[in-house]
Curated annotation (Swiss-Prot):
Annotated source species: Sulfurimonas denitrificans (strain ATCC 33889 / DSM 1251) (Thiomicrospira denitrificans (strain ATCC 33889 / DSM 1251))
Disulfide bonds: none
Recorded GO MF terms: ATP binding; ATP hydrolysis activity; four-way junction DNA binding; four-way junction helicase activity
Ranges for region Large ATPase domain (RuvB-L): 1-181
InterPro entries tied to this protein: AAA+_ATPase, AAA_lid_4, DNA_helicase_Holl-junc_RuvB, P-loop_NTPase, RuvB-like_N, RuvB_C, WH-like_DNA-bd_sf, WH_DNA-bd_sf
Protein name from the UniProt record: Holliday junction branch migration complex subunit RuvB
Gene: ruvB
HAMAP family: DNA_HJ_migration_RuvB
Broad class of where this protein is predominantly found: cytoplasm
Region annotation (Head domain (RuvB-H)) ranges: 255-337
Keywords: ATP-binding, Cytoplasm, DNA damage, DNA recombination, DNA repair, DNA-binding, Hydrolase, Nucleotide-binding
Amino acid sequence: MQRLVEIERFDSEESVEVTLRPSAWNEYIGQEQIKKNLGVFIEASKKRAEALDHVLFYGPPGLGKTTLALIIANEMNANIKVTAAPMIEKSGDLAAILTNLEEGDVLFIDEIHRLSPAVEEILYSSMEDFRIDIIIGSGPAAQTLKIDLPRFTLIGATTRAGMLSNPLRDRFGMNFRMQFYSPEELSKIISQASNKLNKKIADEACSEIAKRSRGTPRIALRLLRRVRDFADVANEKDILHSRAQYALDELGINSYGFDEMDIKLLNLLVGANGRAMGLSTIAAALSEDEGTVEDVLEPYLIANGYLERTAKGRKATPSTYKILNVTMPALDDGGLF
């Protein structure tokens, strides 16, 4: 079952996201420092009539990495080729993409940390020297064919920057860490999207949805669409605060943006009586794999101070005890089980 607060994109959401996605800097809300720096680099590249240096965006899913890549291409007046690492299975697949690029084009590779080592090696020379070496034949008769490439910009996006090899990471001239969004930024995003959906929404309703959206635009837009469903069924022309509040409560998203799975995890940690819990123990108790716990459940809770990762495991924070209305243990022996 898919969670409404899931940060990964649902298969059915791609076309909707395209409709609601901003296409220019003045429409893009949030990530102000990244926008400011990119604006300088883009302007400098345009003045020199050069391709923009390679860019790496990293951070949790749903924060706008793909959108920024599309805006960069738009600002550079460049064509963009969008792909994902799992679709590039062999070095020949990447070579075919690279040899079809034109001068100044942008190549966006999502989930770039999932490239195989063989494919990654092709990127090294193409990023640094704008050249690829293709081996024709095998054995003693094998020959290397050098193919020059037009100067292009590679934009990589990853949720696991630590999984990138050092040689690949070092070839990106710009590295940007995407931050979670403030409730105020999300409110603006929700209002903007509501206009595109031709549905008026009260400011208070925007704020209500925003505070339950876990700092993530993808979740905010998903919740907006579900709240709109409730309003439409109730034959309400506008989305009012009371309707947004009712809809989100019915959907099981509380005022902290927690759903049932979050509450289960936090109750599990609180039940440890101040001791740290190992990742494998948590995963087994929740019937989830460790990767899901680490990459999907934990980031928002850690970023907002509800969960602490220590050398000995995971622990609930004072904020967690407070919102769950549980008294903190007087002693903490720091044990692990």
